[in-house]
Amino acid sequence: MFRLSLGVTLVAAAFFANTAFASHDTIKPVAYDSLGKCVKAALSKKDGKIVKLEMKSERKSPTYEFDIEMADGTAWDVECSVKTGKVTEIEEEVAADNEKFKALAKVSEADAKSTALAAHAGEVVEVEYELEPDGKASYEFDILEADHEEVKIEVDATTGKIVETSYEVYQVGQE
């Protein structure tokens, strides 16, 4: 009896292992987890390559931010609510010398940086230049604070006012 049970167990294990390996190539995000929902939602808006994922606390609400590179070379930040799985914001990342960004920017990067650092002292570790969905331009400063927390401060490039503050929880991928 023991041999029969062991034999059946081994056959079943081999079958399920083979099935698991066979489906490994076609793994897709599952809809029941928040990250899977947000990956699907983000790629439905900008179907490119996800090169970075950040989880941040924005207005005390957990948010995923995907950096997506498109085949045409454009780069997008797509934000998705962890709670709802819905896209909440899409911003185009551009170079500092982008013509549209330069035309909209009335505040210098140095002045915007001073504003961000006045609100959150620390070391600026990254600057992004963004075109917002409403047509505005903004600077986004990633600031490493003394307590080693990373805060993101978004400064409107036209008015010089802080429009958004969020804390990074974690990051996966290239800077």
Residue ranges and their predicted role:
Residues F2-V11, F16-E175:
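Long, terminal "pre-/pro-" and other extracytoplasmic accessory regions
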